[in-house]
């Protein structure tokens, strides 16, 4: 009897196993994406788009021109942003300052690194994506990444 029970349990266990992988409907996996020249262009545009986010733009202004004599704080409202800007204006930046974070620039750097890593593979798959296209995309991503590193080093040093 034990022999029959173990055979039945083993057959049920084998039938219940499924070889398919469940993929999310709202996301694209790398294996399905990096196939065409247009998809590389989408990722290059995405890197530029992430550079234009409000977080990045606000920090570039605050880390750049705001610290010069050309811009000055005139608002006396007492909110978190004004307090953070007052700290920067007084060159007394605390670790809790909302502008003392660098994650948004590392998001841009990550997008550039992904393009630099995956774009060469597309040349082998899509003949319309030439070496000239790749070199153009590569140089843009290297320049954008270097700009982000420039701002990070200028403001946070090593």
Labelled PLM ranges:
Residues 21, 67, 71-72, 79, ...:
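Intrinsically disordered, low-complexity regions of eukaryotic proteins
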């Amino acid at each position: 009897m034990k022999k029959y029970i173990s055979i039945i349990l083993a057959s049920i266990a084998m039938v219940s196993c499924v070889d398919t992988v469940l993929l999310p409907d709202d996301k694209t996996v790398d294996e399905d994406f990096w196939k065409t020249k247009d998809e590389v262009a989408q990722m290059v545009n995405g890197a530029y788009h992430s550079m234009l986010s409000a977080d990045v733009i606000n920090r570039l202004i605050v880390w750049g021109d705001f610290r010069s004599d050309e811009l000055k704080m005139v608002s006396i409202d007492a909110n978190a942003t004004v307090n953070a800007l007052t700290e920067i204006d007084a060159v007394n930046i605390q670790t809790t300052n909302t502008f003392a974070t660098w994650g948004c620039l590392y998001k841009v750097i990550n997008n550039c690194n992904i393009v630099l890593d995956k774009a060469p593979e597309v040349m082998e798959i899509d003949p319309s994506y030439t070496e000239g296209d790749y070199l153009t995309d590569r140089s843009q991503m290297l320049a954008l990444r270097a700009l982000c590193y420039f701002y990070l080093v200028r403001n946070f040093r090593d």
